[in-house]
Regions:
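Class I S-adenosyl-L-methionine-dependent methyltransferase catalytic core
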Residues: 2-241
Length: 241
C-alpha cells in the first residue's frame, strides 16, 4: 500500500469496518487503555501529523515502522503497484536507510535475504485476493527462513469461514520451521458466513515473552472493541522450539 490511508473515503467508508477498530479506540480516554494500546493510539495520531485526523491520515505498517525505527535501522519496502510505490517514495523515500522497491514482495524476500544484520523483522502483508495466496506465503516463508533462520517473520492473514487458514497451518507445521506463534483477534462469531471476522498474525521467531504479554493484552483490547464479547482472541504456539 501507499503507507497512509483516508478511512473517510471509498470502500473504508462504505464498509465502516474502521469504526469498530481504530475509530473505537480513538473514543476512549488514554487512562482507559492499557499502556501498549495507549502507545499505539498516540503513534497513530503522531503519524497523521499536526492538523490531520487519524481517520483521514491513518498510517499503514510502512509509516508505523518508519516512525518507530532507530536512526541506524534499515528499512526495505516492496510494493508491486506503481502508484502505491510512488506514494511510498513521496512520503518515506527521503528518509535515510529507507529503500523502496517497485517489485513483488515475495520476490523481495528471496532477493533481499539474508541481510547484513543478524536480527530484524520481515513483515508480509498479502492482499489475500484468493486462497492460493496462502501457498505463496508459505513458499516465501520457507525461502526466507532458510536464507535467514535468525530473522523474525510476521505474516498477517484474514480470519474467514474458508478452510485455507487451516490448510496453511497444517502445511506450515509440516515444513520443519520451528518457533511458530499464532495470534488472532475476532470481532464476529466463528460461524460468520461471509466476509472477514478478524485478523491473525503468524510470527516465526517471536521476541522472548511476546506470547505471554499478548495473552494478557489481547483480551483487554477485545473488550474495548467488542463490548458484548462477540468473537474472541487466541495466542497459540503452532510449533514449539
Amino acid at each position: 500500500g501507499g503507507g497512509t490511508y483516508d478511512l473517510s473515503l471509498g470502500e473504508s467508508q462504505r464498509s465502516g469496518e474502521y469504526r469498530q477498530g481504530i475509530g473505537r479506540l480513538l473514543e476512549f480516554p488514554e487512562a482507559a487503555l492499557s499502556p501498549e494500546v495507549a502507545q499505539y493510539v498516540r503513534l497513530v495520531k503522531a503519524c497523521a501529523g499536526p492538523g490531520r485526523s487519524a481517520i483521514t491520515a491513518y498510517p499503514g505498517s510502512p509509516t508505523i515502522v518508519a516512525h518507530l525505527r532507530r536512526s541506524t535501522d534499515r528499512m526495505v519496502l516492496a510494493e508491486t503497484h506503481a502508484r502505491e510505490a510512488q506514494a511510498l517514495r513521496a512520503s518515506l523515500g527521503r528518509q535515510k536507510l529507507v529503500s523502496i522497491l517497485e517489485s513483488d514482495g515475495y520476490e523481495a524476500v528471496k532477493a533481499q535475504l539474508p541481510p547484513r544484520e543478524k536480527r530484524g523483522l520481515v513483515l508480509i502483508d498479502p492482499p489475500f485476493e484468493s486462497d492460493a495466496e496462502f501457498d505463496r506465503v508459505l513458499k516465501a516463508l520457507e525461502t526466507g527462513h532458510q536464507r535467514w533462520p535468525t530473522g523474525t517473520f510476521c505474516i498477517w492473514y484474514p480470519l474467514t469461514e474458508r478452510a485455507a487458514p487451516l490448510r496453511f497451518r497444517r502445511n506450515l507445521e509440516a515444513s520443519g520451521i520451528r518457533k511458530v506463534l499464532d495470534v488472532t483477534l475476532s470481532v464476529m462469531p466463528e460461524d460468520t458466513p461471509v466476509g472477514m471476522r478478524g485478523s491473525g498474525l503468524v510470527i516465526v521467531n517471536p521476541p522472548w515473552l511476546l506470547d505471554e504479554r499478548l495473552a494478557e493484552l489481547l483480551p483487554d483490547l477485545h473488550r474495548l472493541l467488542v463490548p458484548d464479547g462477540t468473537g474472541g482472541t487466541s495466542v497459540e504456539w503452532w510449533v514449539g522450539e
